[in-house]
Amino acid sequence: MSTYSFQNFALTLSGPGGSISLGYGSGNDKGGVTFEFNENANTLTTGADGSPMNSLNPGKSGKVTVRLQKTSLTNGLLSAMYNFQRANAANWGNNVLSGIDIVRGDQYACQVVAFTKFPSNTYAIEGGALEWTFDVGVMDPALATGG
């Protein structure tokens, strides 16, 4: 039997201004964390005679979205890190994100990481979530067979 639990997911953002845990225990919203590539790895071209040609795209850029409850103290840590990095261009885009499901073995290694923008923040009847998005220069995934 295979079992999944967000409790087994660890994610760390490290860079100028600190190191912040963004996985289980950081006040995540139900949407959790999403890793997404910007481009397809392949482009299929069909020639005039119908011959197919596959072209491998070497790009590995992507986006990571971390959803935190409005009341998560982690929002304050991310806000401070964002402001610290934005104050000096030498600090911008020098982060690393490391994610792992410690039971199943899935891993994501993300380098050349920058905050995409400060999150939108809605004040309403329900607290909702803040979505922190990060642009990733190089994302290396490895899905495991464990668990």
Region spans (language model):
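Short, acidic/charged, Gly/Pro-enriched secondary-structure junctions
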Residues: 79-108
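Short acidic DE-rich linear segments
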Residues: 143-147
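Flexible glycine-/small-residue-rich
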Residues: 136
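Short, conserved charged micro-motifs
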Residues: 73-79
